[in-house]
UniProtKB/Swiss-Prot annotation:
It comes from the Eukaryota. GO terms for biological process: lysine biosynthetic process; positive regulation of lysine biosynthetic process via alpha-aminoadipate and saccharopine; positive regulation of transcription by RNA polymerase II. PANTHER family: LYSINE BIOSYNTHESIS REGULATORY PROTEIN LYS14 (PTHR37534:SF49), TRANSCRIPTIONAL ACTIVATOR PROTEIN UGA3 (PTHR37534). Keywords: Activator, Amino-acid biosynthesis, DNA-binding, Lysine biosynthesis, Metal-binding, Nucleus, Transcription, Transcription regulation, Zinc. GO terms for cellular component: nucleus. GO terms for molecular function: DNA-binding transcription factor activity; DNA-binding transcription factor activity, RNA polymerase II-specific; RNA polymerase II cis-regulatory region sequence-specific DNA binding; sequence-specific DNA binding; transcription cis-regulatory region binding; zinc ion binding. This is Lysine biosynthesis regulatory protein LYS14. Residues 75-113, 120-142 have a biased composition (Polar residues). SUPFAM superfamilies: Zn2/Cys6 DNA-binding domain (SSF57701). It is found in: Nucleus. It comes from Saccharomyces cerevisiae (strain ATCC 204508 / S288c) (Baker's yeast). Residues 159-186 bind DNA.
């Protein structure tokens, strides 16, 4: 049985399949479990990503990699625009002078960026002398537009330590270069007399982000406070708070491991000024989307449940939840006020009482386990972010409870659950109307608002409602504006979650996802967005060695394939509109949408899709199929060092299965998830872009290759978990194209074992398969096919 799981790589079928893919060449080599890794951007390899905090390792590969602190360096990235301020060009020059001037020992502009995140701890005496001093021959000069040397401005706002030692301070926050070099405590005291000196916009934003948590110490007062739209008053208030914030920073700890705050460079707030990034249109559109989505869900609920119309909604008394006063195991990963995320949030930390606890428990386990199955029974960063914000934002908590009630209703069909679901949504709607009349309030709550929108959209998908696309316009516009270099960790996690929905919507539904424009796809599906990758690695959502995305179930640079396939599919969809009857809403081609190719849909689409571009997609798919996380066959050899019997590591990445013949095998979910998703895209390319018939041997080889990963289901006790969700679409499209009964039998067994968690979706897809296999009731309605398979 073990032999049958692996396809013979030297078989004639595989050689024929290889002809469809790219010719042999110089491909990206798959990262190995034991190899070092570095993030490459535009051909430049950097040894970045090394967070100084000690977050618990959440994945199998992280456990193999050891301490995260020794693998990657998480440093703050600043936008390139900050290097040119006020028309002055900052350049680094080399001088033979040994440095008797005031700049001796001071780092260059480029060195400041590096050294600020890599402080060198050295032994120094009271006079500041150290054996590890920077090269005094390197100086930094400032020139005007004509190239003339301009005298430096006096450092009036330097830290107190540099002033005490009468040394020039580079004013780097939170720790200047001198204090970092000498391991001194760096404290900034704002001098009101220097207020008239104008600082750069980037510096003001950085100061605001660094100390903004002091603005809202009292959460109840913060809710009632009306934000002023005047920037001058806002800056004045920030400065007043900064003048009082001179106490020593308390250490932030996680799981008992002390990490001094002044040593955590990765907690530096991202370089983002929302007042310049977002405008009134963005704010109004985002709030309108959220309002429309809540109203849509209420309308659908009343439409489907006539009994609710005569019932009054219950008056839900949701208690106010204040953030925990203890800062232990909390890390600020947002650029806004009071946004501190508590890791490993326990369900017991919420004391809601009554029916609220029931729905919160359903959300905590059922919903989040289906959204992020690789984090099941482990620390879940997405859960921590949602629940940390929910303690401060009542509208987000209401939407969380509404999602729990929605799941409970689908399980029990109890009208009381649906009634409470509507009540939570109404409560959420009223809170939104109260809190966000002022535009500045929206700006200060932009992250929880986006999380609320995405979560309600997810519930639409979960309930097989296809009206969610139009309500994500505000979110997609924001993601386009907040991209590489100026985002926050929370927004990057939200973007990652959004990309999960967008990926499966674009390949599994009739109308595709919410992104239509090619530029939008390039901006959002960018695997080389360094801050996005950096954020996910910091939160253990992406493994540091192989960059396996635990929230999306594949290697991150698979986005190179995803966005190009989406562009071609959008081209096909734009020409398929002629095949939809506006009056009847029927699909005029008597064929399942996933079987409709560009060759059978329209002559125009054949002309618009470039074969050479498709060939590039096939080359990249071949690279992706060559990646190996543990073993790309999906079955871990018994002598592999990652086998549980050798490594003694038990994780969601691996399951042990005893087959009916008595053989025990270890399966790698990382490889199964990645390989099946890549193969499903290969089928899309072959069927819909190249127009190959399903009867061809090439298509049948890919179909059998997909289903070969699930021969372990031939067991009396096969694994049942949500990690198969990443393979659901691959199994569906393989089943639709399967010609032999043996392969179809594996598809049926897959749905029988794994269909319990998505019962409604499973029944829907099995019905589609029956129509294709046996021609039963071939009435292909458009609305029946516009369902996201997840």
């Amino acid at each position: 049985m073990f032999e049958s799981v692996n396809l013979d790589e030297n078989s004639p079928e595989d050689r024929e399949l290889a002809k469809v893919l790219s010719p042999p060449g110089s491909y990206l080599s798959p990262a190995s479990l034991d190899s070092g890794s570095s993030f490459t951007n535009s051909g430049t390899s950097t040894s970045c990503f090394e967070p100084k905090n000690n977050l618990p390792s959440l994945s199998f590969l992280n456990a193999r990699a050891g301490s995260l602190g020794g693998i990657f360096n998480h440093k703050q990235m600043t936008s390139p625009s900050n290097s040119n301020i006020g028309g002055e060009n900052v350049e680094s020059t080399t001088s033979s002078n040994d440095g008797s001037n005031e700049n001796a020992g001071h780092p260059t502009t480029s060195e400041q960026d590096q050294n600020a995140d890599h402080p060198t701890i050295s032994q120094a005496d009271d006079n500041g002398h150290s054996s590890l001093t920077p090269n005094p021959a390197v100086t930094s000069t400032v020139t005007d537009k004509k190239g003339n040397t301009v005298k430096r401005k006096y450092s009036r706002n330097g830290c107190s330590e540099c002033k005490r030692r009468r040394m020039k301070c580079d004013e780097t926050k939170p720790t200047c270069w001198q204090c970092a070099r000498l391991n001194r405590q760096c404290v900034y005291v704002l001098n009101p007399k220097n207020k008239k000196r104008r600082t750069s916009n980037a510096q003001r934003v950085k100061e605001f982000r660094k100390h903004s948590t002091s603005l809202d110490n009292d959460h109840n007062n913060a809710r009632k406070r009306q934000h002023s739209s005047c920037k001058a008053e806002k800056k004045k208030k920030v400065r007043q708070n900064l003048s009082e914030d001179t106490t020593d920073p308390k250490p932030i700890t996680d799981n008992g491991k002390n990490v001094p705050l002044d040593e955590i460079e990765s907690l530096e707030i991202p370089n983002l000024d929302l007042t310049t990034t977002m405008n009134g249109y963005d704010v109004n559109l985002l709030m309108q989307n959220l309002n429309d989505m809540v109203n849509m869900k209420l309308h659908d609920s009343y439409l489907l449940n006539e009994e609710l119309k005569g019932l009054d909604l219950p008056d839900l008394d949701i208690p106010e939840l204040l953030p925990a006063s203890n800062v232990n195991s909390s890390v600020p990963i947002s650029f806004l006020v009071n946004n501190v995320i508590t890791f490993n949030t326990k369900l017991s930390s919420f004391k809601l009482g009554g029916i609220h606890d029931k729905y919160l428990k359903i959300f905590y386990y059922d919903c989040l386990d289906s959204i992020a199955p690789f984090f099941q029974n482990q620390g879940n960063p997405l859960r921590d972010i949602l629940l940390s914000f929910a303690k401060n934002e009542a509208y987000l908590l209401s939407s969380i409870l509404a999602t729990g009630a929605s799941i409970a209703y689908r399980k029990s069909n109890n009208l009381e659950d649906e009634r409470n679901y509507c009540a939570y949504l109404s409560h959420c709607l009223s809170l939104l109307g109260e809190q966000f009349k002022n535009e500045s309030n929206v700006l200060n709550r932009i992250e929880p608002i986006i999380l609320t929108v995405i979560m309600l959209a997810w519930d639409c998908i979960y309930s097989m409602n296809s009206q969610w696309r139009s309500h994500l316009k505000g979110v997609t516009d924001l993601f386009k504006k907040i991209n590489a270099g100026n985002s926050s960790k929370v927004l990057n996690v939200a973007k990652c979650w959004f990309k999960v929905m967008e990926t499966f919507a674009s390949i599994s539904t009739v109308f595709g996802g919410s992104l239509i424009d090619n530029n939008d796809l390039d901006a959002i599906f960018d695997p080389y967005d360094y801050q996005y990758v950096d954020s996910l690695k910091f939160l253990n959502i992406m493994t540091p060695l192989n960059e396996f995305n635990l929230l999306r179930g594949h290697k991150e640079d698979f986005d190179l394939v995803i966005k190009e396939v989406f562009k071609s599919l959008n081209t096909i969809r734009s020409t398929e509109k002629n095949y939809f009857s506006k009056e009847e809403g029927l699909f005029t081609k008597k064929l399942d949408y996933l079987l409709l190719s560009s060759q059978t849909s329209s002559e125009k689409s054949k002309d618009q899709i470039s074969y050479f571009n498709t060939q590039k997609i096939l080359v990249e798919i071949d690279k992706q199929l060559d990646y190996e996380f543990i073993d790309k066959s999906g079955i871990i050899p018994s002598d592999n060092q990652s086998h549980p019997r050798i490594s003694n590591i038990h994780d969601n990445a691996i399951d042990m299965v005893t087959l009916k013949n008595g053989e025990e095998v270890a399966i790698s979910w990382y490889d199964i998830s990645h390989q099946t998703q890549v193969l499903s895209f290969l089928l899309i390319v072959l069927l819909k872009l190249l127009g190959m018939p399903k009867e061809s041997s090439t298509i049948q080889q890919v179909v059998k290759k997909i289903m070969s990963f699930f021969k372990f289901l031939d067991s009396d006790s096969p694994p049942q978990n949500s990690r198969t969700c990443y393979s659901n679409f691959a199994v569906l499209i393989a089943g639709l194209n399967a010609m032999d009964e043996e392969t179809r039998a594996i598809v049926k067994r897959y749905y029988k074992i794994n269909g319990g968690k998505f019962q409604k979706l499973t029944e829907h897809n099995l019905n589609r398969l029956e129509k294709v296999w046996y021609g039963k009731n071939q009435n292909y309605r458009l609305e029946e096919q516009d369902v996201l398979t997840w």
